[in-house]
Every structure is written in C-alpha cells, then in structure tokens.
C-alpha cells in the first residue's frame, strides 16, 4: 500500500473475506502496528479489527466524536455481522437512533465500507445481566441466570426464539459473548426448567443427607 513514501502492508487475513481489492484501489484501513526498519517505518494495516468499525462510527456520528455518545465495546465477524455497544452521556439523547441515523444513513455508510457487514447497535448497561439481554437482540430473552464465579450466564428463550438467539452458525451468541465478555449458554425455556428441576433435586438430596431427613422434608426446607 502506497502511503506517500511510507510502506503500508495489509495481509489477506486483515482483509474482509470476499472483498475484491485491485491495484490502485483507494482503501480505508486501521493502523494496527508500526515497526521501525532499516528502510524506515513500516505500517501494518487491517480492515478486520474491531477498531476499524469503531473509527468508522466516530467519523460518521458527530455525537461520538464530540464525546456525547460513548462506544463501550465492539465485536465483529468481519464482512458478515457485528455488534456495537453504545451509551449516551446525556439522557436526552438516543444513542441507538443517533448511530443508525436518518433512514439508517449512518449505519449504512459504515456497513458499505465494511463490504456489507450488518451492524447491530446495542444499548450498553452497567448491569451485566441487562447488558447481555440487550446484546442478544434481535432475540428476546425470557430469563437469565448469572454465575459470577464461572463468569457465565444461562439464557432461556421461548422455543420460537432459539434459532434467532443462537444465530447462523452460532453467530449471534458468539458476538454477544465477545461484546459482553461473558460465557453465554442459551437454551429453550423447557430445557431451562428441566435443568433447574435437576439442580433442585441434587440440592435436596445433599440437604437430606446432611440433616438426616427424607427428601420430602428437604424439599419443603428448600422451598
């Protein structure tokens, strides 16, 4: 890549899959590393890192560059889909609407630059469980159980929401996990109920053994 006398390099792994780049094409890319060599500075570029998407939104959305809206996190499956978590510092401002723009113009401009990558704008929340619920969009979460020790959450959804929650090839759940930093397990409500019943049974058996009472009494104590 010619950068006015400075060498810029971009590997095929840093190009968005299936995008066609020809010689002399103008290209937007993120500077991910700069190295000093005997020939001078060498710049390594990427179009697949999260920061590429974040920088594009800063260019397209004035509220972000002005500091009114803050980007809290980003996660990408380059060229296919990504999620961006945002927060407004001014409660009067709608951060999602601002990032989408009039008739979707702002988010579409970013998508076009990223070879048609679909971008979900997510509302960041300081409550980790609520943040995960938001990140699972467009799927609707019915219930969520947090295990802070394991850094995981069990997410239950209606049966007709299960495919949407998982996404094609697990894309939605993987992006939500990357975005929030939590290990996420998604299941149907029926499976969640079965799992809860088994956990209660195990707890009851342990309590009955410890107290020397039968399972029925232990069950009453748990209730």
Please give the residue ranges for each predicted region.
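RNA-contacting regions in translation and RNA-metabolism proteins
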Residues: 1-223
């Amino acid at each position: 890549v010619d950068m006015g006398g400075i060498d810029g390099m971009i590997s095929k792994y840093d190009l968005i899959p299936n995008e066609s780049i020809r010689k002399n094409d103008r290209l937007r890319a993120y500077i991910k590393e700069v190295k000093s060599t005997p020939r001078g500075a060498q710049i390594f570029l990427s179009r697949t890192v999260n920061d590429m998407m974040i920088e594009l939104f800063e260019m397209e959305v004035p509220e972000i560059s002005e500091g009114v809206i803050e980007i809290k996190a980003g996660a990408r499956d380059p060229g296919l889909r990504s999620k961006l978590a945002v927060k407004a510092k001014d409660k009067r401002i709608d951060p999602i609407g601002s990032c989408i723009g009039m008739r979707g113009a702002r988010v579409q401009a970013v998508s076009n630059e990223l070879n048609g990558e679909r971008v979900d704008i997510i509302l960041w929340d300081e409550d980790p469980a609520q943040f995960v619920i938001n990140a699972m969009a467009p799927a609707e979460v019915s219930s969520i159980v947090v295990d802070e020790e394991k850094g995981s959450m069990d997410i239950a959804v209606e049966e007709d929401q299960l495919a949407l929650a998982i996404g094609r090839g697990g894309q939605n759940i993987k992006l939500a996990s990357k975005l929030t930093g939590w290990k996420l397990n998604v299941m149907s409500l029926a499976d969640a109920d079965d799992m809860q019943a088994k956990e209660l049974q195990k707890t009851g058996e342990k309590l009955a053994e410890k107290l020397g009472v039968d399972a029925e009494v232990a069950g009453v104590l748990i209730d």
